[in-house]
Amino acid sequence: MAHKTGAAFADYGAHIIHGAANAMYLPKVIAFNAKDETAKVRYGEIADFMGLGGETLDEKVDLLIAYLRKMNDDLNIPHCIKNYGPDSYPCEQGFVPENIFLERLPEIAANAILDACTGSNPRQPSQEEMEKLLKCCYYDTEVDF
């Protein structure tokens, strides 16, 4: 996803720094992948290794996501594309206008699915799921699919 959104808005002066994109998207991608039981177990193991606590796998995944979101806060990385601004600092309306994001969303989603990195993802998204996931990353909404 980060490969396909990084320069997708460069004509608006909105090059999303690759590391910032990964940081913004990772909590959402974990929430998406954790719908797969094998991936959820692995995320639980990561949370255990990090000493995050939690009794159930769902709690462990939630704590892992919360940890990553807190790290983004500490690093001054916004939680979503909508608030991504100059030098990756959060702002009320970032570089990527909503109408442009929505206009380009189908193509970005299709390209993200075709990206070599997506092939190693534990859960393979459909076009519709990738568009929904990218919207979650734009608006910072819950991944409930």
Predicted features by range, described:
Residues 2-4:
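Acidic catalytic cores of enzymes that act on phosphate-bearing nucleotides/polynucleotides
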Residues 10-104, 119:
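Gly/Pro-rich interdomain helix-loop hinge
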Residues 99-145:
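Short, amphipathic C-terminal "tail helix"
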